[in-house]
Amino acid sequence: MDKDSTYYFIGIKGSGMSSLALILHDEGYKVEGSDIEQYTFTQKGLEAAGIKILPFDPANLREGLTVIAGNAFTDEHPEIKKARAMGLKVIRYHELLGQMLDKYTSIGVAGTHGKTSTTGLLAHVLSGLDKTSYLIGDGTGKGIPDARFFVFEADEYRRHFIAYHPDYMIMTNVDFDHPDYYKDLADVESAFQQVADQVHKGIFAWGEDESLRKINTSVPVYYYGTKENDDFQATNISRTTTGSEFDVIHKGEKLGRFTINLFGEHNVLNSLAVIAVAYFEKVDLDLVQKELLTYQGVKRRFSKEAVADNILIDDYAHHPSEIKATLDAARQEFPDKKIVAVFQPHTYSRTAALMDGFAKSLSLADQVVLTEIFGSAREDAGAVSSQDLADKIGNNTKLIHQDDLSAISDLHDAVLVFMGAGDITKYENAYKALFK
């Protein structure tokens, strides 16, 4: 990499792109980028670092730039076309990240669900114990030139994680998602097998996932979970309204009892994966326990605030399995309150392909409210609607619009769980504005 060049990020507000931009900035590289003008939660960190954010415009491009192209954009994007026409070096996000890993003990976190939460937890724990660079999918990134560890989120979309050859990899689960790219579950499984073959030292995988049990590769695969056949087993689990406690057993030996101020079974599993990695890197597990206790979570993952006499939870969940996990966590922390799911379906292809799963998982809430479907940069229309999903759920499921929140405006002493990967926060802000 060249410190005389300026690294120009096309799509700098993207969750991974903003994280990578922050890492390069921390390591002393010159960084700027472009994106849509609409405010996104990721730009706060970029602005705090003094990184210039420009509106998309081919005129932004000039000699001396190294262009980092966001994976959300095709080669037909006007800025990418202009960069290539000018002869500028153009690197895709995942390619640059892959090039950076060799300097560290690198630990990737892959999985259809739970990547960001687990990456954030691992980064927090290791940062408290040794120098650690990290890239988290919530727009958070930190670069330390002489770091021991590099923790990063490895995205399976379009097989982008094939660019990575890490020392270790955590695999949280394998599920069918991204139906605009993957044909079926077997197609997703083949991608995870491919990246497993590129790991140098070891893989830590959730033991109850049938797809992950099929992984067959040259490095050891250590399974974690709650069953006796798992290499790292969580036992004597206690889930309360303040968090969870559990023992960790490895090869018949109790490694310790651990406490987390987090909710939901998935956070016990995420913590178990982190403990397993720390164990193999010979990190003091008493210190790991102390770091686990101070973890507050990542952005847009079960973020809570009080609004009037209600609790508002903001979460990125946009797949049936994630919705189930988020509602499970809400039930654990607030067992005596009404749970209201406010969900923004994300992409038409995913909504159509996983319709039955969405209906089943959302039905775990006491009440369901839907917004219109959020399209994407790749897909802005489809033959399915939120009303189709509402009809599938039944149980008086309602639809809301940003200027008509009547379905939720009169709720009292309830927990409103806003979920989605699009712009669901605009509905949250409109709701909060009712009480100002």
UniProtKB/Swiss-Prot annotation:
SUPFAM superfamilies: MurCD N-terminal domain (SSF51984), MurD-like peptide ligases, catalytic domain (SSF53623), MurD-like peptide ligases, peptide-binding domain (SSF53244)
Gene that encodes it: murC
Organism: Pediococcus pentosaceus (strain ATCC 25745 / CCUG 21536 / LMG 10740 / 183-1w)
Pfam families: Mur_ligase, Mur_ligase_C, Mur_ligase_M
Annotated protein name in UniProt: UDP-N-acetylmuramate--L-alanine ligase
Gene Ontology biological-process annotations: cell division; cell wall organization; peptidoglycan biosynthetic process; regulation of cell shape
Function according to Swiss-Prot or TrEMBL: Cell wall formation.
Lineage: Bacteria, Bacillati, Bacillota, Bacilli, Lactobacillales
UniProt similarity note: Belongs to the MurCDEF family.
NCBIfam families: murC
Biochemical pathway: Cell wall biogenesis; peptidoglycan biosynthesis
